[in-house]
């Protein structure tokens, strides 16, 4: 059974055991009251006294309907969760001498990733003396970005970091309707790396 974290999160009415509180709410004169008077004001309106800021001095309490108060909290939490952006980054690796077959294979996967709403981090890995081909690697990544211009925009132009030259692409359109993106994480694309990679020294 799921636990309702919102329930019993706030002390209400008789459970509030302090000498005085700062009162807020609709149809009440805001200010500091002793706890008995604050409870009386809430009861006179057939509402609850809800402690919303226990660490304040004095604690802040709201005169409100507790059930509606909890409902609004849940609604707000649900809306915030729906608005949260979950970014998935797929990695695609090339060698400086990648052939057309391998290139097209990875291009196809990149299009699929972008259509799903994922970002694509493509990089050329230079092994040994293949670093001499860094200009060729840059040309390859720019060609990759150009071939994906209908699906993505360049977020980061090719940069060389150690033995890697990387470009970052972000999708132009939102995720496919009905697609539920996985949790935020950086995922290496195993499928895109299964093909043979030509990395000449």
UniProtKB/Swiss-Prot annotation:
Belongs to the IF-3 family. InterPro entries: T_IF-3_C_sf, T_IF-3_N_sf, Translation_initiation_fac_3, Translation_initiation_fac_3_C, Translation_initiation_fac_3_N. It is found in: Cytoplasm. The gene is infC. IF-3 binds to the 30S ribosomal subunit and shifts the equilibrium between 70S ribosomes and their 50S and 30S subunits in favor of the free subunits, thus enhancing the availability of 30S subunits on which protein synthesis initiation begins. Residues 182-195 have a biased composition (Polar residues). It comes from the Bacteria. Residues 170-201 are annotated as: Disordered. The keyword Cytoplasm applies. One of its GO terms (cellular component) is cytosol. SUPFAM superfamilies: Translation initiation factor IF3, C-terminal domain, Translation initiation factor IF3, N-terminal domain. Keywords: Cytoplasm, Initiation factor, Protein biosynthesis. The keyword Cytoplasm applies. One of its GO terms (molecular function) is ribosome binding. Its main location: cytoplasm. Coiled coil: none annotated. GO terms for biological process: ribosome disassembly. Disulfide bonds: none annotated. Monomer. This is Translation initiation factor IF-3.
